[in-house]
UniProtKB/Swiss-Prot annotation:
Cell location: Membrane
Lineage per the UniProt record: Eukaryota, Viridiplantae, Streptophyta, Embryophyta, Tracheophyta
GO function terms (MF aspect): purine nucleobase transmembrane transporter activity; purine nucleoside transmembrane transporter activity
Domain of life: Eukaryota
This protein's name: Putative purine permease 12
Transmembrane domains' residue ranges: 29-49, 62-82, 100-120, 128-148, 153-173, 189-209, 235-255, 280-299, 300-316, 320-340
UniProt similarity note: Belongs to the purine permeases (TC 2.A.7.14) family.
One GO cellular component term: membrane
Any one Gene Ontology BP term: purine nucleobase transport
Topology within the bilayer: Multi-pass membrane protein
Alphabetical keyword list: Membrane, Transmembrane, Transmembrane helix, Transport
Organism the protein comes from: Arabidopsis thaliana (Mouse-ear cress)
Amino acid sequence: MLLLKEEDEGRRRTSVPTQLMKLNRSQWWILVFISIFFLISAQAISVLLGRFYYNEGGNSKWISTLVQTGGFPILYLPLSLLPASQSSSSSSSSSSFKTLVWIYLSLGFAIGLDNFLYSVGLLYLSASTYSILCASQLAFNGVFYYYINSQKITCLIFFSVLFLSISAVLVSLDDDSNSPSGDSKWSYLIGCFCAVFASLIYSLQLSLMQFSFEKVLKSETLSMVLEMQIYTSLVASCVAVIGLFASGEWMLLSVEMEEFQEGQVIYVLTLVGAAVSCQLGCVGAVSLIFLVSSLFSNLISTLSLIVTPLAAIAVFHDKLTEVKMVAMPIAFTGFTFYIYQNYLDDLKVQRAREAQAE
């Protein structure tokens, strides 16, 4: 959910700490590669640990929901390293406290619901099937950016939406796909619906978050993005805790921990690892925005959607059906269209800067 507009890139560079400005080229590349590793690996690991939790006897959907945002205090570390921006303070004076609270509460509630749907989807689906379906978020991105953020839908974006939609439909109709929990076809369809609907909500909240920065807060800096991530995650975590107690799942946690096949220590480490990996992915995304650009960060995040289903097949030996073998290349083609369109947009921005500099 970390989206920063390219035309603001130069202005944000002025807030880069002097420590980064003193980096030589090799040090800069090391930090970039570390950030890429954090982003791709963390997103894949969080999905794999979530599937591992269910495979080994975990059954709490609300605990799985909580770990997706519960590690948000980690984000205070990178936030403390950033300088206080003038735009952040000016936006606070121009935007009422009630407006900020409303934004954090509404987006945080949406994130909490979104994470719950992701948890239900992962419960009923194999990790590879789940990851392929979650790639549909790119298709929804194009639609919401057009209607909410007034961004054009080019031919490449149209074909990206088309290919990703076809891939999602094929996977959802795959009769040979195995449900990891051995549930019925009905449960499999529920998992597919939850994964796709969660991707829709995720894309919607990205567009609404960018809309909030542009139209309400009137500014967008790295500090503000991290603050938005922290406070919305806090609200989403509260939603998960309320759901945990309201559903009565909290009473079964001690039994679940005792019956976890790999033992209580692994149970705790699995949940902690999932929570930490979710936040490390966020740190990696912010770092790439900081070191390179928002476009590059979004592209690497897109590439992680390709890595995750492949990692799931390798780790959990998910059933690679004929339909899935067709759906994955179609989804990858949709990724390619999406990435190439972003490359063209970035090229256009670079040329405009060069022309303005001359």
